[in-house]
Design a protein with these regions (language model features):
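Short, histidine-centered active-site or binding-site loop motifs used for metal coordination
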Residues: 25-28, 122-124, 158-160
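Conserved catalytic core of nucleotide polymerization and phosphodiester-bond processing enzymes
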Residues: 34, 38, 139-144
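Nuclease catalytic cores
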Residues: 4-56, 82-83
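Catalytic cores of nuclease domains that cleave nucleic-acid phosphodiester backbones
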Residues: 46-129, 133-134, 147-155
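Short small-residue beta-strand/loop micro-motif enriched in glycine and branched aliphatics
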Residues: 31, 118-121, 165-166
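Short, intrinsically disordered, charge-biased short linear motifs at domain edges
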Residues: 1-5, 173-175
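Short amphipathic alpha-helical face segments that pack within enzyme cores
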Residues: 43, 133-141
């Protein structure tokens, strides 16, 4: 039996509607419709990535996010915007595009500073029901990819609401 390959977003799609997931992802009978909200989210993510990575000026309608982003840019350590990580079925690191990957994901911003790391996931939607499970998955992959990291502070940054949902993870707590 073939190993099921997954990401957090594909798992959410499956949980939301298994039949739709099967029709779109497995059978490929339909293409997932791109909504205005999805386009907006992609555009904002790209603007935030470019600003945090190399200081590309933000468009006027995104300049209100700059104070939050300046804090991230000033965080000590090696910055990895849009950092791709993957694990194989043995839960060891592999290349994101490896044929052997089992799970993979992209961290919006990863900052590694010695034994401590920061994981930031930009969110453009509502902060009413935050779901930090994606942070937990990214933390597990970060521990696997960065063996010196012992402690991770993670957060969902709801940029449109100037809201931050924080999480903390310790390597010792990983089973």
């Amino acid at each position: 039996m073939a190993t099921v390959k997954w990401s957090f977003s594909s798992l959410k799609d499956f949980i939301n509607c298994p039949k739709q997931y099967h029709e779109v992802k497995v059978k490929q009978n339909f293409v997932k419709k791109v909504t205005e909200q999805m386009l907006y989210g992609t555009e904002v993510h790209k603007a935030l990535e470019d600003y945090v990575r190399d200081g590309t000026p933000l468009a006027k309608n995104y300049q209100r996010f700059q104070p939050m982003l300046d804090v991230l840019r000033a965080t000590p350590g090696q910055h990895y915007p849009e950092h791709k990580m993957a694990l194989n079925a043995g839960k060891t690191p592999c290349d994101f595009d490896s044929v052997d990957y089992w799970v993979r994901g992209i961290v919006d911003l990863l900052v590694v500073n010695g034994s401590q790391a920061y994981i930031i996931d930009y969110k453009t939607g509502s902060n009413k029901y935050p779901d930090p499970k994606q942070l937990k998955l990214m933390a597990l992959m970060t521990f696997a990819h960065f063996p010196d990291v012992e402690y991770i502070k993670g957060g969902l940054l709801f940029v449109a609401h100037n809201s931050f949902v924080a999480e903390e993870y310790e390597r010792d707590a990983v089973p």
